[in-house]
Amino acid sequence: MKLITKYFTHLSEEQLAHFAMLAPLYKDWNAQINVISRKDIDELYLKHVLHSLAIAKVVDFKDGTKILDVGTGGGFPGIPLAILYPNCQFVLVDSIGKKIKVVNEIADRLGLTNIKAYHQRAEDVSGQFDFIVTRAVTRIAKFLPWVKGKLLPNGEHELKNGILFLKGGDLAEEIEESNKKVEIFPISHFFDEEFFETKVVAYTRVK
């Protein structure tokens, strides 16, 4: 929890309580359904929660923003972002049903009414969104066709509506393969933990 309050200093009591509840909830569910690797569960706040919140350092979602989280797994980055932005609407999808079960159970325990989670492939999602977020799902070039037509035009943020990828390592080849303009935001510019030295938020747009 100290990691979260180190970088996000204006959280409400309710937000603080929600973030504090994540560790016991995920440990309990992970014992039943392996949604987070066993070696990472003790570093939940560093490797999953704070990592997810790096997106908030790139774009500060305005009230009413609609966000789609593709391949959410156990709820990352969607659940931490939904706690941080209670007045935004989040749709979380994953092709593995048991993971979505965990997401729904945790969102319900936290009372997060701004999350809807579905056992669904990205291609089958209906509606349009201001931003699409995703973490460690697939290469950019493969991902883009899945979400074609799912972005609302332009928007009201400094960054135009687009896709925010949580990525790691050298992305030069992946970016070239995508044939898209991709903007890179090193997470080490926002968080000083060693874990983030090679981590980035990659941003691009697709019509």
List each model region and its residues.
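A short, conserved alpha-helix within the catalytic core of class I
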Residues: 140-151
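Conserved SAM/SAH cofactor-binding pocket of Class I
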Residues: 53-134, 144
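Active-site capping/gating segments
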Residues: 168-207
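Conserved hydrophobic residues forming the short capping helix/wall of the S-adenosyl-L-methionine
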Residues: 30, 106-107, 151
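N-terminal auxiliary segments of SAM/dcSAM-dependent transferases
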Residues: 1-38
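Conserved alpha-helix/loop element of class I SAM-dependent methyltransferases that forms part
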Residues: 28, 32, 45-63
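Conserved beta-strand signature within the Rossmann-like core of class I S-adenosyl-L-methionine
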Residues: 155-170
